[in-house]
Amino acid sequence: MSSWNELLAQPAQPLTTTQLAVGFVAPISDQGLIALDGEESASFLHNQLTNDVEHLGLGEVRLAGYCSPKGRLLASFLMWRNETTIFLQLPREIQAPVQKRLAMFVLRAKTKLSDASESPAHQVVLGLGGGMAEEALQNWFDPLPAKPFSKVDHPLGTLIRVADAFGAPRYQWLMSAEVAQTVAPELAAKLSVGRTDAWHLSEIHAGIPQITKATQEQFVPQMINFELLGAVNFKKGCYPGQEIVARSQYLGKLKRRTTLVSIADAAAAAGVEVFATADPEQPCGMVVNAAPNGKGGIDALVEMKLAAIEAASVRLGSAGGAPLTFLDMPYVLDPLDL
């Protein structure tokens, strides 16, 4: 393998969770990046997103949501900063409209939004995880980010540690094409090479949902476990939809969560509804994210009623569709009376 282009070439078959757990590297090619520059960038975003931006440290990474006035998620972000810029990572398919909407509210704030997806420093994004990923990365990084949702900035790029999966750390490495050309052969020699869907499969098994075009305005943050993941700060000031998000938390009316399932149906995809066999006439939830599991089926994060999770008899698409096999989540689904 002589170049990073060859590393990013798509392998014929998706990786299995067993392969991911051992160690993998995969291109993350479907994510966009919004950059905000200017002295009021943090205060502007603080008034738009569900999480605290004003106190975001240089070594920190946070999840955050961007809601409609009705409290429904328009986007979810992975968010970090350097000395001058705040970055918001989100699916490329929704980046342009979300960036345009955010820009509408800048008004007189001293901040400028731009598309950083193709900037030289972020031209290549690789996802790594599994038991062998740490050792592979130690060839270039010392120390590695110490805990989930932390990062290090390095001459070779930005290394972000995200939520663990399969009992091992996972990382995103944002780098230039020149760096990728150097490191790709070594990574590919030590780790299983996956497609972008391998990264999404690892995200699903980490219990990290992401809003895509198919699921915009479908969920209040708590429905996809966002407050359990530290993505909602209930002490911060107002943002679009804040009153509804707070009411959902403290009045306990949602009674819904997102959980991990496996489905022996390759048609499972974000936005597809699911049905409880006990109540076949109306959907009990919706697929949030899905990825091939290397065994001919799909693993997915599915939002649904707590009663349906407890009954564990749910089908895809209709009450007669493919059954959902419920898997253990990597964190406790504390109902919080939702």
Features from the language model and the residues they span:
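Anionic-ligand-binding alpha/beta catalytic cores of soluble enzymes and soluble regulatory domains
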Residues: 172-262
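Glycine-rich, small/acidic residue-mixed loop/short-helix segments
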Residues: 224-231, 246-338
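Acidic, low-complexity central loop/insert segments
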Residues: 24-26, 32-33, 78-206
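Short amphipathic beta-strand starts and helix->beta connectors
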Residues: 13-21, 62-76, 106-109, 152-160, ...
